């Protein structure tokens, strides 16, 4: 099989070919072609992706022609609002195809009357043309709640990792993260917060195992995907063990209606004393919509402090043609 691509004036050819499960000289496979086109669409850097099979110069030779239509991949967003934490501001710069090499860059800054958060992440889905994902980032968060809850903490986190397909449909994702946590309290803080005051450093090794049996990565209609994640302390002033399990099962009821059952569970266990406030589990906002970020779970006074255990079951129904989604938790 011969492969030709066109329409990519900004995007490098290597970005397109890195997502293909078919290589030059391979026999034609309709299943691999369908999955390849799905992977290209999932990159979210093309407005349209079209494929065409034409006969070659010989009877047993096929030519795969892939035509793409590029779209703006950069996004700048700014917002302001008034809520339970008072006035808040946010600013985000995101690029999904940096330098036309498929690099993803995300910079965020958000501020409210009691918190300030900033972060920069970057990932390369095809590092050194190996097909392996490599990512890294840094985030810093400052919560100044001396007036309302008697504490102030600053958390800085650095992470780096990779993800690759070890076997067909089996992905392995090892990584490291380094965090610094400084918690200061005054006399009005709760006893639980006073016990956790101080400066703490933690260096962890994290890994994930994922089994992906979906028919395609972009808007799957059948199959399932399951993953297990664990965080192991290499060095920690107050160590803890983190575990997470996720599972999603998809089923297409018709061409227009796709259903999914999703399960999410996570635990964190202290290996010395109590789990630190900054390490407790909170429900990711993308898992349960309709709630403010970090505003679900146990509370200490007026503060949401997270917990040591979390479970979530979700029934999700989507209509891709209408771009409509319904979720039941």
Residue spans for each PLM region:
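Feature captures outer-membrane beta-barrel proteins of Gram-negative bacteria and organelles
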Residues: 89-98, 116-129, 134-136, 156-166, ...
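Periplasmic polypeptide-binding modules associated with outer-membrane biogenesis and secretion
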Residues: 4-86, 92, 106-124, 245-246, ...
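Single conserved hydrophobic/aromatic residue that forms the stacking wall/gate
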Residues: 1-3, 316-319, 323-329
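Transmembrane beta-strand segments that form the barrel wall of outer-membrane beta-barrel proteins
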Residues: 20, 73-83, 90-113, 134-144, ...
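C-terminal outer-membrane beta-barrel translocator/porin domains of Gram-negative envelope proteins
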Residues: 42, 75, 188-198, 202-314, ...
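Short loop/turn motifs that connect adjacent beta-strands in outer-membrane beta-barrel proteins
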Residues: 98-104, 127-133, 148, 166-172, ...
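Transmembrane beta-barrel wall of Gram-negative outer-membrane proteins
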Residues: 118-199, 205-207
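Solvent-exposed loop/turn segments connecting transmembrane beta-strands
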Residues: 58, 81-88, 107-118, 144-153, ...
């Amino acid at each position: 099989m011969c492969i030709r691509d066109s329409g990519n004036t900004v995007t490098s050819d290597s970005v397109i070919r890195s997502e293909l499960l078919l290589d030059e000289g391979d026999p034609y496979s309709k299943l691999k072609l369908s999955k390849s086109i799905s992977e290209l669409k999932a990159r979210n850097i093309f407005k349209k992706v079209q494929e065409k099979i034409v006969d070659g110069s010989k009877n047993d030779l096929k030519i795969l022609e892939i035509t793409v239509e590029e779209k703006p991949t950069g996004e700048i967003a700014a917002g302001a609002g008034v809520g339970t934490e008072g006035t808040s501001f946010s600013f985000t710069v995101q690029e999904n195809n940096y330098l036309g090499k498929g690099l993803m860059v995300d910079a965020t800054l958000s501020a409210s009357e009691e918190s300030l958060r900033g972060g920069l992440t970057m990932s390369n889905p095809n590092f050194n043309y190996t097909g392996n994902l490599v990512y890294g980032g840094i985030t810093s968060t400052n919560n100044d709640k001396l007036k309302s809850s008697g504490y102030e903490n600053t958390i800085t986190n650095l992470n780096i990792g990779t993800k690759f397909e070890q076997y067909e449909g089996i992905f392995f994702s090892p990584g490291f993260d380094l965090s610094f946590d400084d918690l200061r309290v005054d006399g009005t803080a709760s006893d639980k917060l006073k016990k956790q005051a101080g400066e703490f450093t933690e260096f962890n090794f994290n890994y994930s195992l994922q089994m992906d049996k979906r028919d395609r990565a972009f808007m799957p209609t059948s199959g399932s995907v399951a993953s297990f994640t664990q965080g192991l302390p290499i060095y920690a002033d107050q160590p803890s063990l983190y575990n997470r399990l996720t599972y999603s099962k998809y089923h297409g009821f018709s061409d227009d209606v796709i259903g999914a059952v999703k399960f999410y569970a996570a635990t964190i266990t202290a290996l010395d004393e109590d789990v630190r406030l900054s390490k407790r589990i909170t429900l990711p906002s993308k898992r349960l919509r309709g709630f403010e970020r970090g505003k679900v779970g146990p509370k200490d006074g007026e503060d949401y402090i997270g917990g040591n255990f979390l479970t979530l079951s979700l029934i999700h129904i989507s209509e891709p043609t209408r771009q409509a989604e319904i979720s039941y938790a």
